[in-house]
Amino acid sequence: MIPLGYFLIIGAILFGLGFAGIIINRKNLIVLLMCIELMLLAVNTNFIAFSQYLGARAGEIFVFFILTVAAAESAIGLAILVLFYRRRGSINVDDMNILKG
């Protein structure tokens, strides 16, 4: 059996990569959305690792719900980005300040 620390290190690396992607790339909204999803997957990895370590299944069930909500969030976010691209011709963050709401 793989020790818990290895899974936590993998989760921390994935979370760090997602966070670094957000910090480095602040222009493209699709890349920002992908980095946020990577961070969510890192958190899910930690939930699964702790669930296996403690012998409880609550963490795995929680991950299932997180993945469901994340899929819905991604679908809605991509739909908004497609509409924004059709209207403005760009998906840069700098162009988002012209949105009315």
Curated annotation (Swiss-Prot):
GO terms for cellular component: NADH dehydrogenase complex; plasma membrane. Its EC number is 7.1.1.-. It is found in: Cell inner membrane. The keyword RNA-binding does not apply. GO terms for molecular function: NADH:ubiquinone reductase (non-electrogenic) activity; quinone binding. One of its GO terms (biological process) is ATP synthesis coupled electron transport. Its main location: membrane. InterPro entries: NADH_UbQ_OxRdtase_chain4L/K, NUOK/Mnh_C1-like. Keywords: Cell inner membrane, Cell membrane, Membrane, NAD, Quinone, Translocase, Transmembrane, Transmembrane helix, Transport, Ubiquinone. It catalyses: a quinone + NADH + 5 H(+)(in) = a quinol + NAD(+) + 4 H(+)(out). The keyword Cell inner membrane applies. It holds the Pfam family Oxidored_q2. It is a multi-pass membrane protein. The chain crosses the membrane at residues 4-24, 30-50, 61-81. HAMAP family: NDH1_NuoK. NDH-1 shuttles electrons from NADH, via FMN and iron-sulfur (Fe-S) centers, to quinones in the respiratory chain. The immediate electron acceptor for the enzyme in this species is believed to be ubiquinone. Couples the redox reaction to proton translocation (for every two electrons transferred, four hydrogen ions are translocated across the cytoplasmic membrane), and thus conserves the redox energy in a proton gradient. Belongs to the complex I subunit 4L family. NDH-1 is composed of 14 different subunits. Subunits NuoA, H, J, K, L, M, N constitute the membrane sector of the complex. This is NADH-quinone oxidoreductase subunit K. It comes from Coxiella burnetii (strain RSA 493 / Nine Mile phase I). The gene is nuoK.
